[in-house]
Design a protein with these regions (language model features):
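Extracellular/periplasmic envelope-modification machinery, especially enzymes
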Residues: 1-310
Length: 310
C-alpha cells in the first residue's frame, strides 16, 4: 500500500496540480519573453477573419459592396476615401492600408474575393465557372465605385505571370503573347474606368511567397535554432511591372505601391521586420506584420494617401 501511494498517488497528484496551475495561468506565459509572446500573437492575426463579410469565398460571390465595410477614419470626420478590391492578397493588405489611411485621415471600403484579379471585364479563374464568377464579382465592384466618388481605387492581387492559364476569352488562353495582350488591354480599360470616376488608381505589387518555409520560422529561430535561414526571395511581379511601365504616360497620376521596398534588400526578404513575423501562411501577411510594414513605408517612402483630397 505504501509503495502504491509513493509510486502512483503522489506523482499523479503532483502532475494534476501542475496542470491545474498551468490552465489557470494560461500556460505560464511568463516562461517566454514579451518579445516571443508578441511574435506568437502576430502569427495568429488573420485579415480574412477580421474582415469577414467584406472578404468573400466563391460561394459568397453574390455579396455586394457596402458602406458597412468602411474602415480606418470615421466617415463623418474623413478627409477622403478609397476603395480596395482584388483577391485574398488584397484582403491581407487591408491592415496595411488601414494604417496609412488613419494617418491620412481617410476612409477605406474593402471588397475582396478569393482568386479574382481586380480587372474589369476579364474572365479569370481556374475554370470557366470560376472565371465567370470573378467577372460578375468585378462588375458588382465597378457599379459600386461608379456610384460613389472615391479619391483612390486600390488594385491588389496575386498577380499572374506570362505563363498563366487562367485567362478565358472565351476559351482558355495558353499563348504568352495573348496573355500579355489581353491582360494589358483589360488593365488599361479598367484604369480608364477608374479615371472616369475621378479616382486616382493605386496598383500594389505582390509580396513574396515562402516556398515551403514555415511562417513560424523566425519564432523557431529565436527559441530553438539560431542557424535557421528565415528569408525568402522577392517576387519579381514581372508581367505587371512590364505592363505598368508601358502605360505610365497614359496614366500619369497612377500610384505604384511595392511593399518589397520595405520587406526586402535587393532580392533578399527577411520574414520578420523590427522583430515582428510578417506572414501567417505560405503567401499571406498577418495583420500585425502588415501594419508594421505600413509604418515603415510611410516613414521611408511616402504615404500614398499623403495628397488625399479634402
Amino acid at each position: 500500500k505504501t509503495a502504491f501511494i509513493k509510486m502512483y498517488i503522489i506523482p499523479t497528484c503532483f502532475f494534476i496540480a501542475i496542470a491545474t496551475i498551468g490552465i489557470a495561468m494560461s500556460g505560464f506565459p511568463e516562461r517566454f519573453s514579451k518579445e516571443i509572446t508578441a511574435q506568437e500573437a502576430a502569427l495568429h492575426t488573420f485579415a480574412n477573419e477580421s474582415r469577414k463579410g467584406c472578404h468573400s469565398s466563391l460561394r459568397q460571390r453574390a455579396v455586394l459592396p457596402s458602406d458597412a465595410c468602411a474602415f480606418a477614419a470615421p466617415i463623418a470626420q474623413s478627409q477622403g476615401s478609397f476603395f480596395i478590391f482584388g483577391d485574398s492578397h488584397a484582403n491581407h493588405l487591408v491592415p496595411f492600408f488601414a494604417t496609412l489611411a488613419i494617418e491620412a485621415n481617410i476612409t477605406g471600403i474593402d471588397y475582396t474575393f478569393d482568386r479574382c484579379l481586380p480587372i474589369f471585364n476579364l474572365a479569370w479563374g481556374s475554370n470557366t465557372y470560376k472565371a465567370n464568377e470573378c467577372q460578375i464579382r468585378n462588375n458588382q465592384a465597378q457599379k459600386f465605385l461608379e456610384s460613389k466618388h472615391f479619391d483612390y481605387v486600390v488594385l491588389a492581387a496575386s498577380w499572374p505571370g506570362i505563363t498563366t492559364k487562367r485567362i478565358f476569352d472565351p476559351q482558355r488562353i495558353t499563348s504568352p503573347e495573348q496573355v500579355r495582350e489581353i491582360f494589358s488591354r483589360k488593365l488599361i480599360e479598367s484604369l480608364e474606368i477608374i479615371k472616369k470616376t475621378g479616382a486616382t488608381p493605386i496598383i500594389v505589387y505582390d509580396t513574396p511567397t515562402l516556398k515551403g518555409k514555415s511562417p513560424n520560422c523566425t519564432l523557431k529561430k529565436a527559441l530553438y535554432n539560431p542557424a535557421l535561414e528565415c528569408s525568402v526571395i522577392a517576387n519579381d511581379n514581372a508581367l505587371l511591372k512590364a505592363v505598368v511601365g508601358s502605360i505610365k504616360n497614359q496614366f500619369p497620376l497612377l500610384i505604384e505601391v511595392d511593399l518589397q521596398q520595405i520587406m526586402c534588400q535587393e532580392n533578399h526578404c527577411p520574414m520578420a521586420l523590427n522583430g515582428v513575423p510578417l506572414f501567417r501562411d505560405e503567401d499571406h501577411l498577418n495583420e500585425i506584420g502588415a501594419k508594421v510594414i505600413a509604418e515603415q513605408y510611410s516613414k521611408q517612402i511616402q504615404n500614398p494617401f499623403a495628397k488625399a483630397k479634402g
